[in-house]
Structures are given as structure tokens and as C-alpha cells.
């Protein structure tokens, strides 16, 4: 019960931060929610690994050599339920491996796993790299909250105990009697109350994501048009970007690789990306919606960043030239 309480407190705090709406608080909400999800996954995975190790011990009881058909079938059935130690170490360490294992076991829908991979990348960006995507952080926080509550309800650890020192008065806030022993709907009731008051409808999330992508594509079109006005080819742009990035890193200049024009080899994709963004209007499932949004965002971001860097570098060079001309 204490573990459930810790998860609920995180979700309550994340909800409060989301309702506030300030970007700085939405950032904290995403960090809290990502941690809550990872802890929920960790608890469920631990149960899975304990079960797998039990089967591994059972497997050791079989004698070596060929068994009769029935015995061999049983041995193969038990062996299929074990997990190699090397994989267990990866599952214990990596978020993505936890998602893969629970998806393979049928405990985590594929759409949920895909969305969580994108959202975990969001958390890594804003926590470790201080990169906050301001226009999409609110929809991301809402979807992550929705998933976290769903996992709290569905990924129940193998057992839940009540200790004599447990404080269960907090259940009163959810309309649950002080002694909820035997209730099968405890988590569902808590989840319903947690979701109340948040705009978790798919229409609102969809509109925000499409508007966000539209604004970014507009900026990319404007930057592309500006650079085209200078008569610069994708090869020219790639060379300028490579030169600029080496200069920023304090590295000596080097000849550009003429064959490598990334990310400007994707300039022709702008029309397709805009069409794909418009296509999100037909998606009614939030998880599928965010999965497609995240995939599209990951695809366009290298070109978006490259265009902006070259535009900024040209503008900075122009300002330096103006200062020199004025004798500044």
C-alpha cells in the first residue's frame, strides 16, 4: 500500500503542475511522470524476473539427456518461461528493454510502448540537455499523465500488503473507506479521480500537436526560402553547416565531404511532412496520435535545426560585416 501511495503522490503533484500550465512547471511534471512510469515498470518487471528465475530453478531439476515426449514437452514449456541472465541485466538497466519485455509478455500494448519511447526521449532532452519543446510540452505531459494513470491501474505488482504502520487515511480523498481490504476496484477509483479536471480528450491534444507542427513547418519554409534567395544549393548549405559546427566546437576547419549533404537532402520532404501533419486529423487514438507525431518530429528536427543554424550564422556574419564597415 505504501508503494501505491508514493505513486499516487507523484501523480497528484504532476497533475497540480499541469493545471498550473507554466512551461517550467510542465517540465517538472514530465520529469515526475516519467519517473512514476519507470518505477511502475520496474515493479512489474521485477515480478516477471522473479517468476523467470523460479522457472530456471525448476528447469535445473530435469535430468540431463533425452526425456520421453511428455517430459520433453514440459521441459520446453518451462524453458520458454526463463529469461537469460544477460537479458535480465539489460532489462534491469534500460527503460526501453523494460518496454520490450512487457510488450512481448502482452502486458503493455504496442502503442503504449511506442508512445513511451518518444516521451522518455522528451524527458531526457528536457532534464539532461535543457531542451524544452515549449509548444508540445503540454500535450506531452497530458498524454504521459494519462499513460501513467493507466499503468498504475493495469500493471499491478504481484501482491499488495497492508502494514500496521501504513497510513491509509489518504484514501478518504478518493471516497474509499478506511479499510479497503478486498476491493478489486481500488486503483480504478483512484485513477478516475486523478484524471478528473484534466483536458485529456483526444480533440484537444490533437489540435495542439497539429498547431505545433504547423508553426515549426512554417518557420522551416521561411528559412528555406531565405536561403534559396542566396542561391545556395543543398551541397553549399551542408558545407556551411559543417564549417559552422566545427568553428563552434573550436575545431580546425576541414574540407567538406561533398557526398554528405545531410540534413539538406531532406529539403524535398517539407511538402510530405506538412501532408503528414495534416493527416493527424484523422487519428482518434491518443497513443497512436502521439506515436505518429513523435516519429514525424524526430524526422524533421535535423533539417529544422540545420536550416536555423545556417540562417543564424549568415545573419551573424552580416552583423559583423556591418560593424566592420562602421568602424565599430
What are these regions (language model features)?
Residues 29, 48-59, 165-170:
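Short, glycine/acidic-rich hinge or "gate" loops at secondary-structure transitions
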Residues 49-121, 128:
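A broadly used, surface-exposed interaction patch
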Amino acid at each position: 500500500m505504501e508503494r501505491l501511495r508514493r505513486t499516487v503522490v507523484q501523480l497528484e503533484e504532476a497533475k497540480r503542475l499541469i493545471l498550473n500550465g507554466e512551461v517550467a512547471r510542465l517540465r517538472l511534471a514530465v520529469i515526475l511522470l516519467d519517473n512514476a512510469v519507470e518505477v511502475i515498470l520496474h515493479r512489474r518487471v521485477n515480478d516477471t524476473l522473479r517468476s523467470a528465475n523460479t522457472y530456471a530453478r525448476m528447469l535445473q531439476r530435469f535430468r540431463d539427456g533425452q526425456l520421453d515426449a511428455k517430459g520433453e514437452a514440459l521441459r520446453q514449456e518451462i524453458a520458454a518461461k526463463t529469461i537469460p541472465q544477460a537479458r535480465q541485466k539489460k532489462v534491469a538497466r534500460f527503460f526501453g528493454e523494460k518496454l520490450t519485455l512487457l510488450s512481448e509478455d502482452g502486458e503493455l500494448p504496442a502503442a503504449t510502448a511506442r508512445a513511451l519511447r518518444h516521451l522518455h526521449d522528451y524527458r531526457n532532452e528536457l532534464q539532461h540537455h535543457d531542451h524544452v519543446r515549449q509548444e508540445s510540452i503540454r500535450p506531452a505531459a497530458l498524454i504521459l499523465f494519462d499513460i501513467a494513470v493507466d499503468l498504475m491501474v493495469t500493471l499491478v505488482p504481484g501482491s499488495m500488503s497492508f502494514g500496521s504502520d501504513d497510513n491509509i487515511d489518504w484514501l478518504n480523498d478518493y471516497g474509499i473507506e478506511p479499510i479497503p481490504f478486498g476491493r478489486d476496484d481500488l486503483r480504478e477509483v483512484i485513477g478516475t479521480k486523478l484524471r478528473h479536471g484534466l483536458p485529456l480528450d483526444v480533440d484537444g491534444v490533437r489540435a495542439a500537436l497539429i498547431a505545433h507542427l504547423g508553426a515549426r513547418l512554417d518557420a522551416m519554409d521561411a528559412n528555406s526560402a531565405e536561403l534559396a534567395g542566396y542561391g545556395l544549393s543543398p551541397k553549399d548549405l551542408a558545407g556551411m553547416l559543417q564549417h559552422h559546427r566545427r568553428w563552434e566546437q573550436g575545431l580546425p576547419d576541414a574540407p567538406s565531404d561533398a557526398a554528405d549533404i545531410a540534413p539538406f537532402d531532406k529539403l524535398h520532404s517539407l511538402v510530405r511532412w506538412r501532408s503528414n501533419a495534416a493527416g493527424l486529423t484523422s487519428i482518434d487514438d491518443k497513443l497512436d496520435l502521439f506515436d505518429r507525431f513523435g516519429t514525424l518530429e524526430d524526422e524533421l528536427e535535423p533539417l529544422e535545426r540545420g536550416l536555423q543554424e545556417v540562417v543564424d550564422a549568415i545573419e551573424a556574419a552580416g552583423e559583423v560585416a556591418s560593424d566592420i564597415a562602421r568602424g565599430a
